[in-house]
Amino acid sequence: MGSFSIWHWLIVLVVVLLLFGRGKIPELMGDMAKGIKNFRKGMTDEAEEAKTVEHRTDEPVGEVKQKASKS
């Protein structure tokens, strides 16, 4: 009861083709591929930014320890 037969998949395919047409489906797939590509590019850009974080120390360590011990 929970599995789909070949007839179910054929009906779904016919409905999708009727709704979108033959020309629209490749266009939708191309747009989805572009979206995935941009998402991956964004993820790698963020990872590269995280690697290049600048570590600055404006205050000497001793002063920071004193401030931390006072709080």
UniProtKB/Swiss-Prot annotation:
Example GO biological process: protein transport by the Tat complex
Disordered: annotated span: 47-71
Entry's transmembrane regions: 1-21
InterPro entries documented for this protein: TatA/B/E, TatA/E
Localisation per UniProt entry: Cell inner membrane
GO cellular component: TAT protein transport complex
Keyword Protein transport: yes
Annotated membrane topology: Single-pass membrane protein
UniProt keyword terms in alphabetical order: Cell inner membrane, Cell membrane, Membrane, Protein transport, Translocation, Transmembrane, Transmembrane helix, Transport
GO molecular function per UniProt: protein transmembrane transporter activity
Basic and acidic residues: compositionally biased ranges: 49-71
Assembly notes: The Tat system comprises two distinct complexes: a TatABC complex, containing multiple copies of TatA, TatB and TatC subunits, and a separate TatA complex, containing only TatA subunits. Substrates initially bind to the TatABC complex, which probably triggers association of the separate TatA complex to form the active translocon.
Known role: Part of the twin-arginine translocation (Tat) system that transports large folded proteins containing a characteristic twin-arginine motif in their signal peptide across membranes. TatA could form the protein-conducting channel of the Tat system.
Record family assignment: Belongs to the TatA/E family.
Record-given protein name: Sec-independent protein translocase protein TatA
Gene expressing this chain: tatA
